[in-house]
């Protein structure tokens, strides 16, 4: 799925400010940096995943532009602004547990995004995004095996490309 997602995003991410919510081992984070992202905020709250994320960063020489956050997206996203791209791969259980956490992620990501920024969020086949996020509009959704990825953008975006 990672390769398909980067084919969708474009091969180069030169200078972009990217946020990787629920970064896990950092696969998306490090791929984005290798494709020229100027800054990637990798957010990972999991006590077992954070050491793996740090070890992977060290193996890669702690790449320039990498900012690791051993914290929840609720703690980090409110401090970020003018983000070009947010990638969120929350645990699928978040969709099954009433989706309140997903709704909060959408709300905070909408505030962090630049006017032309994009949010890519992954979900489990059969699950859906919660309604009631008036600041984001779903532009496209693609299926990848047992999951999907949706592209959302701010409703008030300033470009005219749609």
What is the predicted role of each segment?
Residues 1-162:
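Class I S-adenosyl-L-methionine-dependent methyltransferase catalytic core
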């Amino acid at each position: 799925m990672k390769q398909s997602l980067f084919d969708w995003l474009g091969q180069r991410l030169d200078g972009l400010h990217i946020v990787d919510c629920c970064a896990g081992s950092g696969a998306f984070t490090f791929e984005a940096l290798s494709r020229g992202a100027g800054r990637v905020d990798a957010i990972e709250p999991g006590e077992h995943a954070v050491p793996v994320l740090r070890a992977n960063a060290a193996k890669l020489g702690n790449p320039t532009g990498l900012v690791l956050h051993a914290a929840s997206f609720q703690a980090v996203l409110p401090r970020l602004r003018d983000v070009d791209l947010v990638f969120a791969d929350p645990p699928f259980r978040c969709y099954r547990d009433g989706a309140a956490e997903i709704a909060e992620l959408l709300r905070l990501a909408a505030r962090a995004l630049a006017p032309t920024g994009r949010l890519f969020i992954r979900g489990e086949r059969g699950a859906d995004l919660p309604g009631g996020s008036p600041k984001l509009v779903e532009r496209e959704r693609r299926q990848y095996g047992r999951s999907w990825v949706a592209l959302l953008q701010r409703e008030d975006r300033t470009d005219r490309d749609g």
